[in-house]
């Protein structure tokens, strides 16, 4: 329809979209193909593509995303997960392929770099049904590998040009970007926390707090600091402009998003406030609902989850990331 608002990525229909950040344009130099409807085809950057069964009737969009992540991780378990907790391999996220029941395991930084739709918001889930039916009362234990010296944290603030809010600053100093011991969810939203959050001096510089934010300037103004990838988007803290220290969620499949949205638009109307502080945010996290775990297990046991064989799978990944899927 003439004058209708375009979905994110629509301008690239029938073409290829490249990340804005120069660092990512070099790493993923072939770009991501876009279908006639403006949805990205992640297959060339996938370590695995999984075909999922139809969604249960009446399931909400938040439940649908969590269910799909759980099911895909049962099909492609992470061999580095000592507890077999069902988490996604670090540095990777599950991306929905549009207009079908398939998900692709793709690099988290590439998925976050491109504004797009094509996920659960365009599927059969009920958009009016939000939130998750959590059935536990305790937050996840925090895992980490190292602490940061106070001088290092001060240098981080100098590089970023902002004073980190106290709650998040303490988390960064104590864990250098820790992660939950098991996949965690927030009762009000449809994301899964199963990745290490951004830290410093990471082996992959796109997991580095400073480098990662340099690639997200089209997403966040200077009032916000991205602090990690989620299955379902990005986590950010507010660092300026009032309400400093609050934690926010950017949904990477938000149907309200438009192709011409700026970083200011994202901050004004596309972020979801999760908590007053990072400590409160972590305390609100819960284990994945047992009802969704059961649905994923039944689908696997019934043979309704299959690995898709496609010669294009992973064909555009950098050589260092083309190892077989875990």
Sequence positions of predicted segments:
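Nuclease and nuclease-like effector domains acting on nucleic acids or nucleotide cofactors
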Residues: 1-93, 97-138
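Structured loops at beta-to-helix junctions and adjacent beta-edge loops in soluble globular domains
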Residues: 53, 108, 228-230, 239-240, ...
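Short, surface-exposed beta-strand/loop "edge" segments at domain boundaries and coil↔beta transitions
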Residues: 57-59, 102, 233-236, 254-264
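Short, well-ordered loop/turn elements at secondary-structure boundaries
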Residues: 87-89, 99-101, 220-222, 230-232, ...
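Short, surface-exposed beta-strand/loop micro-motifs that present aromatic residues
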Residues: 95, 234-240
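A surface-exposed partner-binding patch
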Residues: 133-234, 315, 319-325
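Compact, glycine/acidic-enriched structural inserts
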Residues: 248-288
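Charge-dense, low-complexity intrinsically disordered regions
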Residues: 298-326
């Amino acid at each position: 329809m003439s004058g209708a608002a375009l979905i994110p990525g629509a301008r690239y229909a029938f073409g290829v979209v490249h990340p804005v950040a120069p660092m990512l344009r070099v790493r993923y130099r072939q770009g991501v193909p876009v279908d006639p409807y403006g949805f990205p085809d992640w297959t060339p950057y996938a370590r695995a593509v999984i075909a999922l069964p139809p969604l249960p009737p009446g399931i909400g969009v938040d439940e649908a995303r969590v269910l799909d992540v759980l099911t895909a991780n049962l099909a492609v378990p992470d061999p580095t997960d000592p507890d077999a907790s069902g988490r996604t391999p670090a540095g990777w996220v599950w991306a929905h392929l549009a207009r079908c029941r398939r998900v692709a395991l793709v690099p988290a930084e590439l998925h976050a770099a491109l504004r797009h739709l094509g996920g659960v918001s365009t599927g059969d889930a009920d958009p009016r049904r939000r939130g998750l039916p959590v059935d536990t009362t305790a937050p996840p234990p925090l895992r980490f590998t190292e602490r940061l010296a106070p001088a290092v944290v001060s240098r981080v603030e100098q590089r970023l040009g902002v004073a980190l809010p106290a709650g998040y600053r303490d988390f960064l100093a104590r864990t250098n970007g820790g992660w939950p011991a098991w996949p965690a969810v927030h009762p009000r939203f449809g994301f899964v926390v199963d990745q290490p959050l951004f830290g410093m001096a990471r082996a992959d510089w796109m997991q580095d707090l400073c480098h990662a934010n340099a690639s997200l300037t089209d997403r966040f103004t200077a009032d916000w600091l991205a602090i990690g990838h989620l299955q379902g988007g990005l986590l950010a803290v507010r660092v300026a402009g009032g309400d400093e220290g609050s934690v926010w969620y950017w949904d990477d499949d938000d149907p309200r998003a438009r192709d011409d949205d700026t970083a200011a638009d994202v901050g004004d109307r596309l972020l979801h406030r999760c908590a007053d502080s990072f400590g409160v945010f972590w305390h609100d996290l819960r284990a994945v609902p047992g009802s969704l775990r059961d649905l994923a297990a039944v689908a696997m046991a019934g043979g309704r989850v299959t690995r898709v064989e496609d010669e294009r799978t992973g064909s555009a990944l950098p050589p260092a990331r083309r190892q077989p899927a875990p």
